[in-house]
Amino acid sequence: GHYAGALENWVRLQHDYETYFLIADYQVSDYADDIKRVRDAVWEVALDWLAVGLDPESSSFVIESLVPEHAELTTWLGWFLPVSMLERNPTLKAEMAAMENPEDGSQERKPVPVAFYTYPVMQVANILLPRAHLVPVGEDQLPHIELTRETARRFNRRFKEIFPEPEALVGRVARLVGTDGNAKMSKSRGNTIDLKDSAETVAKKVKGMYAGPPRGATEPGLVE
């Protein structure tokens, strides 16, 4: 999903623009208390990028935690955005709903951490810090781009024209359905086909993909 929706586009863009690709190691939720796992994940992401053709000679790989200005700008921008605006963010609403109402059938509800409210602000900071003009995203990330544009406008009105209002660039595949039929393929939902998967694992996942409700042999499948 990440390849079809983002990486494929990034490989092309790196030869035409000055590009910065972010490894967002601050933005973890499932294992934020496991530092080794976070560090290992950083390497895995970088290796995936190299494997698909991203070239450090043509673009910059940025590890979020190694640039403290990301956290600093997040703090400053937090003073310009009302909580009500963040609560309307559809991605934030979906993630919070998933934590409060688990889809795996368990009755245990995860408490929503404060960081979930600052998560969209940090994404805004990640875009504004390098003063990005064009941001390659999937369809589900468009609300984040609009939030970034609104934040830039508020900041520029308060002070002076510092941040450009970035434009979104949606790739060839705007949104890829998960292997379980969920509207979005996502690692957090465990419905992905990973770049590092073996041929046997890929075959198993493909054969087990959700193709819609039971139908007759002559009826086409349909996933909404």
Predicted regions, residues:
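N-terminal Rossmann-like or analogous alpha/beta NTP/dinucleotide-binding catalytic cores
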Residues: G1-V124
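Active-site cores that bind ATP or allylic diphosphates and position pyrophosphate for catalysis
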Residues: K93-E224
